[in-house]
């Protein structure tokens, strides 16, 4: 490709409304342009990267035995009514009516459509197992689209759905998809971690997320320092204390604490060890019989709402009770709450169950109890894992301790079981002629999100540093003053021809432009390898080569450059 015949569209200035580096660089590099909130057009450079990501995803899915199909983005509402998600999904589901007043949605996901398709097309166990995938546009009406392609309303996704009659083949397909996702991200040259994850609104049993590691990642990953164990912070298991509860050494006493509205203030004013304090959080209960529930964690720990959501007593999704409700039921406000004398159900974290001589609110404004001990002062409450893990704690496999990293979720695989097939009556006849409900798996990759995540992991102060496999161009040719030198023009044109014939994606900057601008554009759009051609190089019989990632420069003899670049591009 010649720059003179290409829509390069680079920008010097960083757009004011772009918060994260991938959004900034995708705009500056001329990859995307905003049409409306969360909606973008891909320009040629962006589309080249997107198509390369898409190609790798497609190749690995095909290798894993999945079969490509294509389903409509517009979906009839009655399918969503069947599964109950018409009411449950919320405002992210964009709903509309056609000219005949029939309800439709813009698909944020395709479980309903694929299940409807399979129940009509598959009738016998002989047709199973089956794994179908598509690469299709999705739409989620995010309340606040931000971060460019990291959280846009319209995005490109690969979603696959598998169908089974037995758990064994479902497990085999799940493992195949796990390996395929690992291969996809490895081929793209990205540092990533597969992590245990919560199934979220889609539902199901086993689930893994695939995270590209980046400091800007929205998700916190807890991983083992001594094994492959890793989990989303929402899913990471807290260790059950092995040490017995300490004996009581203090008397229970009621203390005036008028200026201690938070744990931090309490600890500072009374010189307490924060691990000897607890936080009492009041959430909405799951039934009229238990309208409020108290969740108690240690003062230095944080409540894990995903874990709390799974408690039978707690309403789903977890909702913090209002101060008015709390005062009406307990008689005190947040900041003065604790377990003694509490007239609502209590669930405490494992770490709280082994505490002794601890401090908590007295359920009277501006008062706390110090020296609280279980059994002596109150019975031990229901115990559960309801907190986030912290660095340094032992991991559940016993092979290391927790460390933390930030990640960007780009893939998610689920074992759905019968969540959708049962509600939609998707059945087949088994070997005995008996009707059986299908087991399902679901496997998603954010194709357009990978593009942004790759940038978040690969950039410097000059621009993007693309991994080889997904770069828009592998080689950039920079001829110095080619419009004034026939020698430079001839050699640049010959190299351009040779690289094209070798099947290497090459961009020739044939503009009448200053060298500084040419260099800046090549580095901004992240071309991995650049070759500089000038009269001085020609006189010396060498090309000047520069590696974008390392910054290394080399003089390569004319007759060796083509082989050198072929090897460099292969990595």
Swiss-Prot record:
Transmembrane segments: none annotated. One of its GO terms (biological process) is prolyl-tRNA aminoacylation. Keywords: Aminoacyl-tRNA synthetase, ATP-binding, Cytoplasm, Ligase, Nucleotide-binding, Protein biosynthesis. The keyword Cytoplasm applies. One of its GO terms (cellular component) is cytosol. It catalyses: tRNA(Pro) + L-proline + ATP = L-prolyl-tRNA(Pro) + AMP + diphosphate. Its EC number is 6.1.1.15. It is found in: Cytoplasm. GO terms for molecular function: aminoacyl-tRNA deacylase activity; ATP binding; proline-tRNA ligase activity. The keyword ATP-binding applies. NCBIfam families: PRK09194.1, proS_fam_II. Homodimer. Belongs to the class-II aminoacyl-tRNA synthetase family. ProS type 1 subfamily. Catalyzes the attachment of proline to tRNA(Pro) in a two-step reaction: proline is first activated by ATP to form Pro-AMP and then transferred to the acceptor end of tRNA(Pro). As ProRS can inadvertently accommodate and process non-cognate amino acids such as alanine and cysteine, to avoid such errors it has two additional distinct editing activities against alanine. One activity is designated as 'pretransfer' editing and involves the tRNA(Pro)-independent hydrolysis of activated Ala-AMP. PANTHER family: MITOCHONDRIAL RIBOSOME PROTEIN L39/PROLYL-TRNA LIGASE FAMILY MEMBER, PROLINE--TRNA LIGASE. This is Proline--tRNA ligase. The gene is proS.
């Amino acid at each position: 490709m010649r720059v003179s015949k290409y829509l390069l569209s680079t920008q010097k200035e960083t757009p004011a409304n772009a918060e994260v580096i991938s959004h900034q660089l995708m705009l500056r590099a001329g990859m995307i342009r905003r049409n409306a909130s969360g909606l973008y057009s891909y320009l040629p450079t962006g589309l080249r990267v997107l198509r390369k990501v898409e190609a790798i995803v497609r190749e690995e899915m095909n290798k894993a035995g999945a079969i490509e199909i294509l389903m409509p983005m517009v979906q009839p509402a009655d399918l969503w009514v069947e599964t109950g998600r018409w009411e449950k999904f919320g405002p992210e589901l964009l709903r509309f009516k056609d000219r005949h007043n029939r309800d439709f949605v813009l698909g944020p996901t395709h479980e309903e459509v694929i299940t409807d398709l399979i129940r009509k097309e598959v009738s016998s166990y002989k047709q199973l197992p089956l794994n179908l995938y598509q690469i299709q546009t999705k739409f989620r009406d995010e309340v606040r689209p931000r971060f460019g392609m990291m959280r846009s309303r319209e995005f490109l996704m690969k979603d696959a759905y598998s169908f089974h009659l037995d758990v064994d083949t479902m497990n085999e397909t799940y493992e195949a998809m796990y390996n395929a996702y690992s291969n996809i991200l490895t081929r793209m040259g990205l540092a990533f971690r597969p992590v245990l994850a919560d199934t979220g609104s889609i539902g199901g049993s086993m689930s893994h997320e695939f995270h590209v590691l980046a400091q800007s990642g929205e998700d916190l990953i807890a991983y083992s320092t001594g094994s492959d164990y890793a989990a989303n912070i929402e899913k990471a298991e807290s260790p059950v204390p092995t040490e017995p509860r300490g004996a009581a050494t203090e008397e229970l006493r009621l203390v005036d604490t008028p200026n201690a509205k938070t744990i931090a203030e309490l600890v500072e004013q009374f010189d307490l060890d924060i691990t000897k304090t607890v936080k009492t959080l009041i959430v909405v209960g799951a039934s009229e019989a238990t309208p409020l529930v108290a969740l108690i964690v240690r003062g230095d720990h944080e409540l894990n709402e995903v874990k709390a959501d799974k408690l039978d007593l707690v309403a789903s999704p977890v909702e913090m009770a209002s101060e008015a409700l709390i005062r009406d039921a307990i008689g005190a406000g947040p900041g003065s709450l604790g377990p003694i004398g509490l007239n609502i159900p209590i669930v405490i974290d494992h770490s709280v169950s082994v505490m002794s001589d601890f401090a908590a609110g007295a359920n009277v404004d501006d008062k706390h109890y110090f020296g609280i001990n279980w059994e002596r002062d109150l019975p031990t409450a229901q115990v559960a894992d309801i907190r986030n893990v912290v660095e340094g704690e032992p991991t559940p496999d016993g092979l290391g301790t927790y460390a933390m990293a930030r990640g960007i979720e780009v893939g998610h695989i689920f074992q759905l079981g019968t969540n959708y097939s049962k509600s939609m009556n998707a059945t087949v006849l088994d070997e005995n002629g008996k009707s059986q409900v299908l087991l399902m798996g679901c496997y998603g990759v954010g194709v357009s999100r990978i593009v942004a995540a790759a940038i978040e992991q690969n950039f410097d102060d000059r621009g993007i540093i693309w991994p080889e496999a997904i770069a828009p161009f592998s080689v950039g040719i920079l001829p110095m003053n080619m419009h004034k030198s026939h020698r430079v023009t001839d050699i640049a044109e010959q190299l351009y021809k040779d690289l094209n014939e070798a099947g290497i994606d090459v961009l020739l900057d044939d503009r009448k432009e200053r060298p500084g601008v040419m260099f800046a554009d090549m580095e901004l759009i992240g071309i991995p390898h650049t070759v500089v051609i000038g009269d001085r190089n020609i006189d010396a019989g060498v090309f000047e080569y520069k590696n974008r990632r390392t910054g290394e420069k080399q003089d390569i003899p004319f007759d060796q450059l083509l082989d050198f670049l072929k090897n460099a591009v292969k990595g």
